[in-house]
């Protein structure tokens, strides 16, 4: 048995009873071990492509305009030639499928521009209006510069998108591991950044999949503000693997700290 996307755990087993204690032991070993991450201060701000102001044109988000975006930029990368970008872009749908992040019955749409290739994922429709819906991936972009970005819907209910202090780190960690599982970025050091488009309608609250909220505190409503992290460090590639949870916690706390409700 092997975790193909990360290579973290590898062992053999005969029965489920034989496997379970090995998995539990490996989890305890990883939790008690040293952090796999190593950080280094950046000499200058990274040149990131943000999509916060682009809106959702071309994406099937079922009317949702507030999206979480996560960017991974490899350091010391020459980027891609037009031929390399096209080749990798054509492989993106297959790479997305292999990760298991998107169900096989959900269609994927590919698109391209001068500077990037993209794959979009249609949002799952809720059973009825106002039904709570968890966060979900809606787009993957690969830029000519080497940057790999994902956009996803935040958890939301009838009162709007939610920045849940517990759910947000888990969603970001999932996107980080998904990015690593695409097996595109292999450089030793990367820069990470996260942001939320149209954040005025978001609220810091607890997401409950079983029931929608009846009230929400929209401290940012009617105000113009940006909700994004400003990276000043690079980190090792383990941030897309064993160190994803640790990095995601930092990014989530930074986003929430910048929200007007946190003031």
Language-model segments: residues:
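Short glycine-rich, low-complexity/disordered patches
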Residues: 36-43, 104-108, 181-202, 257-263
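Cross-kingdom TIR/SEFIR domain
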Residues: 1-24
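Hydrophobic, Leu/Ile/Phe/Ala-enriched alpha-helical segments that form helix-helix packing faces
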Residues: 3-5, 27, 92, 96, ...
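Long, low-complexity regulatory tails in eukaryotic proteins
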Residues: 191-263
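Short acidic, glycine/tyrosine-flanked loop/strand segments centered on an H-E-D-like triad
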Residues: 131-160, 214-231
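Charge-rich interaction segments
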Residues: 16-150
